[in-house]
């Protein structure tokens, strides 16, 4: 694929010392996102999604290119992924859609055992007071797809007692993790289902309804 070759050509040219700086890596990936994305597609995606998404930019970078970029970052990170943890923090602060998608892939695939880190704790600390459902589900789905266990009951209850955005994230985790075959106690599900959602929020209402349906099947 031409766009993948273009990305490979771009990455080959990078100085290996770039991996020592999360700031330089953040600049590098921002430069890499548009590779292989036609300008008209970029403009169309931005015009269509920007107003309601909460993202600072949307370029339309294909998922496969983001995965290739994440693989290159992890492969060249050396013996520790601590710089990549700092990069994840920078990506969330910049908050382009490609930033959040790349952060999700990185978060799911870093060596958390070696660093003594917990991906769910990192995600909780990364999110902004207002986030789109898309940005949260990108991360939740990526962690579950990578076979990461869902948050513990204690972590889930902490989310439930937190700010609204964290409460809403706990609902999404229950739903997505249940679809991936994980089981939660009835007590925990009842606690999470007691969360109040904004009137007229059709997405969260549907998620609540689907959780109820899934519970009825067990």
Map each language-model feature to its residues.
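Alpha-helical scaffold domains
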Residues: 1-218
């Amino acid at each position: 694929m031409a766009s993948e070759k273009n990305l490979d050509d771009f990455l080959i040219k990078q100085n290996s010392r770039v991996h020592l700086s999360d700031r330089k890596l953040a600049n590098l990936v921002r430069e890499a996102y548009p590779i292989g994305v036609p300008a008209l597609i970029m403009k169309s995606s931005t015009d269509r999604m920007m107003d309601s998404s909460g993202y600072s930019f949307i370029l339309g970078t294909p998922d496969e290119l983001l995965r290739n970029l994440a693989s290159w970052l992890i492969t060249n990170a050396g013996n520790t992924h601590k710089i990549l943890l700092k990069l994840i923090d920078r990506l969330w602060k910049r908050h382009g859609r490609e930033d959040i998608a790349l952060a999700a892939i990185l978060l799911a695939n870093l060596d958390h055992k070696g660093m003594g880190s917990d991906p769910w704790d990192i995600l909780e600390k990364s999110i902004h007071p207002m986030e789109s459902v898309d940005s949260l589900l990108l991360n939740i789905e990526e962690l579950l797809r990578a076979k990461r266990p869902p948050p513990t009951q204690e972590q889930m209850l902490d989310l439930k007692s937190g700010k609204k955005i964290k409460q809403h994230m706990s609902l999404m985790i229950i739903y997505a993790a249940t679809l991936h075959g994980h089981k939660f106690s009835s007590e925990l599900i009842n606690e999470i289902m007691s969360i109040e959602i904004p009137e007229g929020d059709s997405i969260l209402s549907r998620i609540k309804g689907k959780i109820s349906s899934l519970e009825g099947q067990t």
